[in-house]
């Protein structure tokens, strides 16, 4: 059994606050300076890895003490993770770097049930956490005193421009995509798919040549950026019981391998074709995302095909590197992957707890890391009705998933649910003491699902439109049937 290492960091704030400073995230108007002081308590005889499996950080925010719990994201990389870049003469260079002892964590604030966090501890502490409903960012200060860190609210980062940033998707009817086949070809029944809690997306990210030049040919800087983005993606998708495993990172360091243009739809089409004819033949994966340094026409910052996950040509998205804040890039990539998983743009009736949700068509000044209730339903329908077989298999190597810890609000192997400690659990379907669903649970979501049970037969689940009749639940399924 893996020994869990407990690390306490005391962050002592300096007796002053900064008024304005230029950080990696941009110009920050108000920040606190803190100093990490690390105190390690190791069990006797335990070897000390470079990066511990679990850590705690104690510090003050706005004068109030908080405790940040961190747990290493052991599902970040697949066992066969690889990286590819190209020499100046076009030769492909592929390596399998050791990534088991990495430095990327998920976290939460103690006694704050709604808190989340995504932190890298590679060179100091860098990332974000949510405290009492507000997002804070932390990063090392580039001073002669290497221990100094800045903590600041996301709202205090000066916005780069006032122009809206939007998804380029306009088609929201997945049935219009002819190549997508129905789930009748799947080996699993719809009910087996519904109650198989884990889904695994094996992801490839490609950084184009403009990304390479934008970061001055620094491969390590691009790697770190993408690792941080994928770590945040996992934080966002875990509430859908989806794990994102990075299986390959490709950097077009010599030249672009497709025609990357400012017309987002054309670039998406070219990237999908390249994935099917080139990438898939040398690296097995479920989905590929292109991160590009180009500025797309108009307000578009990303685009993807809808309900296309597992399709060789269509399971792709493209994202513009539009911000210095990696969280915003991750929100955009999560949005495009959401389209791949059957999600459409949110309407005014969609909610995720008072925030602008991930599938909002326009990137908000205060973006959320949560999917809306509409997205949950649309994703559920995709799993039931589309050929989603590829995301039902676990990536290579069971050791990429950490041993389950019931009550940490992270769904892990062997658990059917994890809603936190019993006093904080908000999931009526989940037994917080065992992290198993109650034996009487029939469903978790759907228009004909209420309090974990199928709604009674005859219950109206969709009102009539035009000459149609009301749609009514059957009492045997969580889905609202059509009258056809």
UniProtKB/Swiss-Prot annotation:
Residues 403-484 form the Disintegrin domain. Keywords: Calcium, Disulfide bond, Glycoprotein, Hemorrhagic toxin, Hemostasis impairing toxin, Hydrolase, Metal-binding, Metalloprotease, Platelet aggregation inhibiting toxin, Protease, Pyrrolidone carboxylic acid, Secreted, Signal, Toxin, Zinc, Zymogen. GO terms for cellular component: extracellular region; plasma membrane. One of its GO terms (biological process) is proteolysis. It is found in: Secreted. Disulfide bonds join 310-390, 350-374, 352-357, 406-425, 417-435, 419-430, 429-452, 443-449, 448-473, 461-480. A motif (TDN-tripeptide) lies at residues 465-467. The modification Pyrrolidone carboxylic acid (Glu) is found at residue 191. Ca(2+) 2 binds at residues 405, 408, 412, 415, 418. Its cofactor is Zn(2+). Glycans are attached at residues 259, 297, 373. The active site is at residue 336. Binds 1 zinc ion per subunit. The keyword Metal-binding applies. Its EC number is 3.4.24.-. The disintegrin domain belongs to the long disintegrin subfamily. Belongs to the venom metalloproteinase (M12B) family. P-II subfamily. P-IIc sub-subfamily. Homodimer. Snake venom zinc metalloprotease-disintegrin that hydrolyzes azocasein, gelatin and fibrinogen (Aalpha and Bbeta chains and partially gamma-chain), and exerts a potent local and systemic hemorrhagic activity in mice. It inhibits ADP- and collagen-induced human platelet aggregation (IC(50) = 0.3 uM and 0.7 uM for ADP and collagen, respectively). This inhibition is dependent of protease activity, and probably occurs through the degradation of an unknown platelet receptor. This is Zinc metalloproteinase-disintegrin BlatH1. It comes from Bothriechis lateralis (Side-striped palm pitviper). The lineage of its organism: Eukaryota, Metazoa, Chordata, Craniata, Vertebrata.
């Amino acid at each position: 059994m893996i020994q869990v290492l407990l690390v306490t960091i005391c962050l002592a704030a300096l007796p002053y606050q900064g008024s304005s400073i230029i950080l990696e995230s941009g110009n920050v108007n108000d920040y606190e300076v803190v100093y990490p002081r690390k105190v390690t308590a190791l069990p006797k005889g335990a070897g000390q890895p470079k990066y511990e499996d679990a850590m705690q950080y104690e510090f003050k925010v706005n004068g109030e003490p908080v405790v940040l719990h961190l747990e290493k994201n052991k599902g970040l990389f697949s066992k066969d993770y690889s990286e590819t870049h190209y020499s100046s003469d076009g030769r492909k260079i592929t390596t399998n770097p050791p990534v088991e002892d990495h430095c990327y964590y998920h976290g939460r604030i103690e006694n704050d049930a709604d808190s989340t966090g995504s932190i890298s501890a590679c060179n100091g502490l860098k990332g974000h956490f949510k405290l009492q409903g507000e997002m804070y960012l932390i990063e090392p200060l580039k001073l002669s005193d290497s221990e100094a860190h800045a903590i600041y609210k996301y709202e205090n980062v000066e916005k780069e421009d006032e122009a809206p940033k939007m998804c380029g998707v306009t088609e929201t009817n997945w049935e219009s995509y002819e190549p997508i086949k129905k789930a009748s070809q799947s080996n699993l029944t719809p009910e087996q798919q519904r109650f198989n809690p884990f889904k695994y997306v094996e992801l490839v990210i490609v950084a184009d040549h403009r990304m390479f030049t934008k970061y001055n040919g620094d491969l390590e800087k691009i790697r770190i950026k993408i690792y941080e983005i994928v770590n945040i993606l996992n934080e966002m998708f875990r509430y859908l019981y989806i794990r994102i495993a990075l299986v390959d990172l490709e950097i077009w360091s010599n030249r672009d391998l497709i025609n990357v243009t400012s017309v987002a739809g054309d670039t998406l089409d070219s990237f999908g074709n390249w994935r099917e004819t080139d990438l898939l033949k040398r690296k097995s994966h479920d989905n590929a995302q292109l991160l590009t340094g180009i500025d797309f026409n108009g307000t578009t910052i990303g685009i993807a095909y809808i309900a296309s996950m597992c399709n060789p040509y269509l399971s792709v998205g493209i994202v513009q590197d539009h911000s210095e804040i990696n969280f915003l890039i991750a929100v955009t990539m999560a949005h495009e992957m959401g389209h791949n998983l059957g999600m459409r743009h949110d309407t005014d009736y969609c909610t995720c707890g008072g925030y602008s949700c991930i599938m909002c068509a326009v990137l908000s000044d205060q973006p959320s890391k949560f999917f809306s209730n509409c997205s949950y339903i649309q994703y559920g329908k995709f799993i039931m009705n589309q050929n989603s077989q590829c995301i039902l298999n676990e990536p290579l190597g069971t050791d990429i998933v950490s041993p389950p810890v019931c009550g940490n609000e992270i769904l892990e192997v062997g658990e059917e649910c994890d809603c936190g400690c019993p006093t904080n659990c908000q999931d009526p379907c989940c037994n917080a003491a065992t992290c198993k669903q109650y034996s009487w649970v029939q469903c978790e979501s759907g228009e004909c699902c209420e309090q974990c049970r199928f709604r009674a037969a005859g219950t109206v689940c969709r009102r009539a439109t035009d000459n149609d009749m009301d749609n009514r639940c059957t009492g045997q399924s969580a889905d609202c049937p059509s009258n056809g």
